[in-house]
């Protein structure tokens, strides 16, 4: 039999071929790696058989087995630098910043990090070491202080429906309202040009000292509102605010702060009580600075302090400046004007402008922040209690002279620390 006939016979019998160990037929290529018919997949010959063909099953990729169940290998998604627009009611929290090792003091970041892990945005070990996700907040709001426009920067996995998934693991009084991609080296604190805070207070705080401390029928007159705005405008510009914090000396350069604007809006009535909102925009603020700025203006309008105390407070002399309660303080907005000028129009990055989220911000304030301030003021009377302490301050002398009187502000009013945008 010649070779052509032998080759034809082999082809005719190919369908009935059965793999067996043994010598390979001369002239035929090795069959290792060819796909095995299903009937033969479970009957593989011994790989050690000399000259035998080895059938390999390659249809199913390898899977990890955990707990007796097949588990797909984890996806490896690239991390991206983003910013989140946050709103929260600060009541019941010990500020924004997480304090690792102090689990008894619950913070806003505790709930946020937990939600990020549960949503699948960050691995679990990033929750214990926030540096791994390059986390930074714009402002370190303190105990009891709320925010309508806080911004944090971090690296996350950009999963589908990311905002909905994060919010599903957050309490209703903490919301993520927006997300934007930013440059890889973006730092929300360092890139922030200015911050806008608002301070909501009952207008009876501006009533003359001869009236009842808590007169709920009081309504702010146009003349008094004009006086308030005239005094608040005095803060505009650069001044030495060492008397408005406990952290700075009169000659420390960092005590000088630049205020862009400060004014009081038209009053409004909630639950029969009239309120007003003071807004202040500045490059940065020190601990308690805004509360003391409000407190000193209230003392002047009520008739406890002369207007000249404002100028004295910016000098090197130590001046007794009262600190208003922390209840009404809210971080309203943060500004990134220089970043937007450089990257906002480059075609690669979005400007950090939250105009489209304004409706959600307003709705959150109306649903969570303002009602909390109103109800807490009615229940705890924090402003009325603080107003009762104003007569014990010595506005004509120095702060040292006031301390000699032995006067002390009730500890219940010290619970809510201030704005906390410290260096």
Curated annotation (Swiss-Prot):
Catalytic center residues: 142 (nucleophile)
Keyword terms: Cytoplasm, Isomerase, Mitochondrion, mRNA processing, mRNA splicing, Nucleus, Phosphoprotein, Transit peptide, tRNA processing
GO molecular function, one term: chromatin binding
Modified residues (Phosphoserine): 411, 416
Reactions catalysed according to its record: a uridine in tRNA = a pseudouridine in tRNA; uridine(38/39/40) in tRNA = pseudouridine(38/39/40) in tRNA; a uridine in mRNA = a pseudouridine in mRNA
Spans annotated as Disordered: 32-75, 403-423
Domain of life: Eukaryota
Phosphothreonine modifications at: 422
EC number in record: 5.4.99.-, 5.4.99.12
One Gene Ontology cellular component annotation held by this UniProt entry: nucleolus
GO biological process, one term: RNA splicing
Compositional bias annotation for Basic and acidic residues: 57-68
Pfam families associated with the record: PseudoU_synth_1 (PF01416)
Deletion phenotype: Impaired muscle morphology and physiology leading to impaired exercise capacity. Mice were born at the expected Mendelian frequency. At 14 weeks, mice display reduced exercise capacity, probably caused by alterations in muscle metabolism related to mitochondrial content and oxidative capacity. Cells show reduced pseudouridylation of cytoplasmic and mitochondrial tRNAs.
SUPFAM superfamilies with a match to the protein in the record: Pseudouridine synthase
Role played: Pseudouridylate synthase that catalyzes pseudouridylation of tRNAs and mRNAs. Acts on positions 27/28 in the anticodon stem and also positions 34 and 36 in the anticodon of an intron containing tRNA. Also catalyzes pseudouridylation of mRNAs: mediates pseudouridylation of mRNAs with the consensus sequence 5'-UGUAG-3'. Acts as a regulator of pre-mRNA splicing by mediating pseudouridylation of pre-mRNAs at locations associated with alternatively spliced regions. Pseudouridylation of pre-mRNAs near splice sites directly regulates mRNA splicing and mRNA 3'-end processing.
PANTHER family registered for this protein in UniProt: PSEUDOURIDYLATE SYNTHASE, PSEUDOURIDYLATE SYNTHASE 1 HOMOLOG
Subunit structure of this chain's protein: Monomer. Forms a complex with RARG and the SRA1 RNA in the nucleus.
Protein's recorded name: Pseudouridylate synthase 1 homolog
Source organism of the structure: Mus musculus (Mouse)
Gene: Pus1
């Amino acid at each position: 039999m010649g070779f052509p006939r032998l080759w034809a016979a082999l082809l005719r019998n190919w369908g009935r071929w059965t793999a067996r160990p043994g010598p390979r037929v001369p002239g035929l290529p090795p069959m290792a790696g060819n796909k095995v018919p299903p009937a033969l997949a479970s009957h593989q010959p011994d790989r050690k058989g000399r000259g035998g063909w080895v059938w390999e099953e390659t249809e199913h990729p390898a899977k990890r087995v955990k707990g007796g169940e097949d588990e797909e290998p984890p996806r490896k998604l690239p991390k991206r630098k983003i910013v989140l627009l946050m709103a929260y009611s600060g009541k019941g929290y010990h500020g924004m910043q997480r304090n690792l090792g102090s689990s008894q003091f619950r913070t806003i970041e505790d709930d946020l990090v937990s939600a990020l892990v549960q949503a699948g945005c960050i691995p679990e070990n990033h929750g214990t070491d926030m540096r791994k996700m390059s986390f930074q907040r714009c402002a370190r709001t303190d105990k009891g202080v709320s925010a309508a426009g806080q911004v944090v920067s971090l690296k996350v996995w950009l999963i589908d429906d990311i905002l909905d998934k994060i919010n599903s693991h957050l309490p209703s009084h903490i919301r993520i309202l927006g997300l934007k991609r930013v440059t890889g080296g973006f730092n929300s604190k360092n890139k922030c040009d200015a911050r806008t805070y608002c301070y909501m207070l009952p207008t009876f705080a501006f009533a003359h000292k001869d009236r009842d401390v808590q007169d709920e029928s009081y309504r702010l007159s146009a003349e008094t509102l004009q006086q308030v705005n005239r005094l608040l405008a005095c803060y505009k510009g650069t001044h030495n605010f060492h008397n408005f914090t406990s952290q700075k000396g009169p000659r420390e350069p960092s005590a000088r702060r630049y205020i862009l604007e400060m004014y009081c809006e038209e009053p409004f009535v909630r639950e029969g009580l009239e309120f007003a909102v003071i807004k202040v925009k500045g490059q940065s603020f020190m601990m308690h600075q805004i509360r003391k700025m409000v407190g000193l203006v209230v003392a002047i309008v009520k008739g406890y302090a002369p207007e000249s105390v404002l100028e004295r407070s910016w000098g090197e002399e130590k001046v007794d400046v009262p600190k208003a309660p922390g209840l009404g303080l809210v971080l309203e907005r943060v500004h990134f004007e220089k970043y937007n000028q450089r990257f906002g129009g480059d075609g690669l990055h979005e400007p950090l402008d939250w105009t489209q989220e304004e409706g959600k911000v307003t709705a959150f304030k109306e649903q969570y922040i303002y009602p909390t301030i109103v109800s807490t003021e009615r229940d705890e009377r924090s402003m009325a209690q603080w107003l009762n302490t104003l007569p014990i301050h010595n506005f004509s002398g120095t702060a040292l002279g006031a301390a000699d009187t032995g006067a002390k502000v009730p500890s219940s009013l010290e619970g809510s620390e201030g704005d906390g945008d410290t260096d």
